[in-house]
Amino acid sequence: MNYTEPKVIYTCFPGGKHKVLTMSYDDGRLEDRRLVELFNRYGIRGTFNLNGGLPRPERIPESEWVELYKGHEVACHTYHHPTISRSPLDQTARQVLADRMQLEGVMGYPVRGLAYPNGSWTPEIAALLPALGIRYARVVGDTHDFAMPHDFMTWKATCHHTHNLLEDGKRFVELYKTQYLYMMYVWGHSFEFRTEEDWALMEQFCQLVGGREDTWYATNIEIVDYMADAARLQYTAAMRSPPERQWRWYETDLPHFARRTV
């Protein structure tokens, strides 16, 4: 049997893109209304981490969740926002499950993400989460790089929106090497936009990174699901090659996945 020369197969984002941008905002404060409108204007998508059990005077009422967060993701932030590293593990489980149930009852879809409240977590909590139906969890802190995470249960963002946002955004849009996958992940709280200058900074960022053909705009869970689907693909050892120097796309029946061979 004659074997073909090995071919290069890359995991790409939808449409063959090699960059993804995602946002993550906590606590469901009233300022989310303006932030969501800004994201929607520039085609940017993100995840909003809500607490089902906290008083609502300064938070988005449940009656607005479905419409406001349409096109984005709602994820857990625990029911009461405790510092869970100080809590018994069984109580942490109850905090997560109660929040999931509350959010799912309103949103009507499985809620599978978490932002650790107060940035508080332990390895034992991270190990518990998959049994509670949680597929990823965001920690606090910034990497200021664009690498894909090695562990989605301790997912650290590129930057907080007050930490070098435009500088990191400019570096992100200038990335061009398509043999790598790049992710920019911005996190924060909408109540931190206290002045018009703060809002102007975020709009400047959205103008910079929005509407770019090389970038996929995704929620947190979409990235997690996509990478999991890609990892489950099976390939034969001998790949049939296309004509020399011709690029082809092979779509599978997995959501949004494409592979490219050369």
Predicted segment positions?
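A short, acidic, amphipathic alpha-helical segment used as a generic capping/interface helix at domain edges
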Residues: 166-177
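Short acidic, S/G/P-rich loop/turn micro-motifs used as interaction or catalytic elements
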Residues: 29, 162, 191-194
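Hydrophobic "anchor" residues on beta-strands that sit immediately upstream
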Residues: 22-23, 73, 215
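Non-membrane alpha-helical structural segments and their capping/turn regions in soluble enzymes
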Residues: 89-94, 163-166, 196-199, 203
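Boundary/entry segment of secreted carbohydrate-active catalytic domains
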Residues: 1-31
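Metal-dependent polysaccharide deacetylase catalytic core of the NodB/CE4 family, i.e.
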Residues: 40-135, 141-159, 182-191
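C-terminal domain-boundary segment and adjacent tail
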Residues: 2-13, 41-43, 56, 104, ...
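Active-site metal-binding loops of divalent metal-dependent hydrolases
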Residues: 25-28, 78, 190, 220
